[in-house]
């Protein structure tokens, strides 16, 4: 089930655009971060969306985009459940971050975060937060990555420990993220 908290989190960091635009990596995107280059709307999705919002309802672009985002999040959840057998055991906050990452960068790229996933599986929030920050994803999304690392850390002392480790081991990345830490 897709929580309201997850929807608000994704909306906050994706923002809404009712017209197609090029995202930060040059992909055509619309709505709340729907990459239409890699994931174009299928005719089935269009019909399904009209069923959800009503055939005779005037198109409200933001409402339509939110329904599309919810469908995409359901797809992410299905994929994560297939690839991460221990997903049901993580906290709601950790699941929120994994869902947000799966939505933002795609599940295949998320699965490449092996050290972060290993840390989550082993209940090591400091390492999980550090590994998220120690990534190209973090240098590209900055504020979103720092927010997700805070959530993974679980508390401010764990987050401080993760960021101190980043400053010591990866000062180049720390400097890029410092404004948001």
Each model region followed by its residue ranges:
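Short, His- and charge-rich active-site/binding loops that engage polyanionic ligands
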Residues: 28-29, 36-44
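Long, amphipathic alpha-helical surface segments
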Residues: 1-19, 25, 34-38, 64, ...
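A residue-level signal for beta-strand positions that form part of recognition/binding surfaces
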Residues: 7, 27-29, 95
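Short, polar loop/linker segments at the starts of domains and inter-domain junctions
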Residues: 22-25, 43-47
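Extracellular/periplasmic catalytic domains that process cell-envelope and extracellular macromolecules
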Residues: 22-24, 90-93
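Alpha-helical segment that forms one wall of the substrate-binding/catalytic cleft
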Residues: 44-86, 92-100, 104-112
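Short, surface-exposed linear patches
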Residues: 51-54, 91, 120-121, 142-143
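Structural recognition of the beta-strand scaffold that forms the well-ordered cores
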Residues: 29-31, 97-100, 127
């Amino acid at each position: 089930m897709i929580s309201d908290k997850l929807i608000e989190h994704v909306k906050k960091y994706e923002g809404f655009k009712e017209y197609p635009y090029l995202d930060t990596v040059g992909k055509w995107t619309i709505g709340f971060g729907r990459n239409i280059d890699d994931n174009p709307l299928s005719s089935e999705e269009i019909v399904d969306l009209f069923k959800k919002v009503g055939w005779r309802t005037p198109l409200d672009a933001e409402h339509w985009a939110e329904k599309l985002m919810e469908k995409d999040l359901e797809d992410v959840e299905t994929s994560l459940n297939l690839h991460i057998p221990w997903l049901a055991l993580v906290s709601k906050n950790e699941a929120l971050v994994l869902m947000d990452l799966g939505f933002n960068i795609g599940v295949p790229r998320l699965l490449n975060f092996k050290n972060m996933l290993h840390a989550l599986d082993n209940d090591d929030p400091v390492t999980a937060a550090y590994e998220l920050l120690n990534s190209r994803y973090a240098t590209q999304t900055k504020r979103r990555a720092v927010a997700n690392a805070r959530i993974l850390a679980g508390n401010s002392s764990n987050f401080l420990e993760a960021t101190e480790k980043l400053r010591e081991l990866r000062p180049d990345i720390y400097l890029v993220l410092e404004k948001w830490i």
